[in-house]
Amino acid sequence: MGGFVDDGAAGLAPSHGSSRAGRGLEGAGVFLRFVASLLSIAGLMLLVKDNQTVQQMVATEAVTLETKYSDISAFVFLLYTNGLVAVYCFFLALASVFSLIASARSGKLAGWVTFVLDQGLAYVLLAAAAASTEVLYLAENGDLKTSWAEICSQFGHFCHMARASIVVSFLSMLAMAVLSVMSAQQLFSKYRRPMTAKTAQDI
């Protein structure tokens, strides 16, 4: 006696399950993109406000010293990178929200573009945060070999703001790294072979 598995029953159940899982992943991605955008905005704003003016006595005269983020190229690089990540994540999150509401599915080309941009921006943000960390280390500790003096004893507020911006930027980078994994999973799931009904035979 032989049995036959109905094509509709065999194909629809896995399809609905994978569809729900896919939409759940997209929803998590939207939330994480808003988080990454907010973190990058916070890192950017901390740098924009990062300036300090102090007065130092030289002989009998008071000399005014000022430092700001724009004096350091690594901090400028970090600021623009955070701005780019914030704009990218915000608009892509909005596009994803409209896609979820309209129950529309993105194609493979859009998946590849998102995957490449997520990966690229994660690496660029990592590079910017790492370069800024090195500069901050020199500002806090100096370098005797190159005769660079530390400045954080004089510009404590400046160093504190820079440190906070770097920490927030690293958190945004971690969010981008997770998004890279998620976009890779969504992209390569489009290349999986569709499930087909199989004929079952009793021996």
Swiss-Prot record:
Q: What is this protein called?
A: CASP-like protein 2U2
Which protein family is named in the record? Belongs to the Casparian strip membrane proteins (CASP) family.
Predominant place of localization: membrane
| Matches recorded under Pfam families | CASP_dom
Side Extracellular, residues: 49-73, 130-163
Which stretches of this protein does UniProt put in the Cytoplasmic compartment?
Answer: 1-27, 95-108, 185-203
User: How is the subunit organization of this protein annotated in UniProt?
Assistant: Homodimer and heterodimers.
Any one cellular-component term (Gene Ontology): plasma membrane
Which parts form a coiled-coil structure per UniProt?
A: none
- Record's keyword terms, sorted: Cell membrane, Glycoprotein, Membrane, Transmembrane, Transmembrane helix
**Parts of the chain that traverse the membrane:** 28-48, 74-94, 109-129, 164-184
Record bears the keyword Zinc: no
Q: Which organism is it from?
A: Osmunda lancea
Q: Which InterPro entries match?
A: CASP/CASPL, CASP_dom
- Residues of the region (Disordered) are 1-21
Query: Localized where?
Result: Cell membrane
Annotated glycosylation sites: N51
Q: Does the keyword Magnesium apply?
A: no
